[in-house]
Amino acid sequence: MIKFRDTNEPDGLSRLINREIDRALITERALEVKHDYLGASVLGDPCDRRLAYRYAGVEEDGIDGRRLRIFEAGHAFEGMLVRWLRLAGFDLRDLNPDTGKQFEFSVGGVRGHVDGIIARGPDLGVSYPLLWEAKSLNDAGWGKLLRNGLEAANQIYFGQVQTYLSQLPPIVPYGGVSPVRLKTCLFTALNKDT
């Protein structure tokens, strides 16, 4: 029987619950269909060897439950950002109306799935449409982004945005007739520590 309050190990129950959650997440990931492509979200990785392994389909040595929890929390935060931006008057399209899935592209063995496209929004001095990418960052990453900008703060995220801007097929903007290539990205970051 598990004691809810073990004086010898006060975090015992929490540790046991987290262990079970981690096991379940690891099992769930193991059952997922493996990608047969290199995700554009990793192309900015400065480690050529890691990119080569990923391109060859070699899995990382055991992504642990903690990292899987972080990934899943990031997806939840992204959903919050979608809602907030829409409430603020942005026409944010996170699904391609033609496919019902994320906007995507495929070039050779590389594929990318973008978080969304902002078709129009409040008059803020920017030209619409915009590529939209969302990330949740801890306080240290958030501070680095504010101080240094995206390119210096995170090469992987910067590479991801640049790849999407250059490879995403042209889209028909809101109220438009002719397809246009996205030239600008609204990169939104949520500080998950505050």
Language model regions located:
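Metal-dependent nuclease catalytic cores that hydrolyze phosphodiester bonds in DNA/RNA
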Residues: 1-131, 138-140
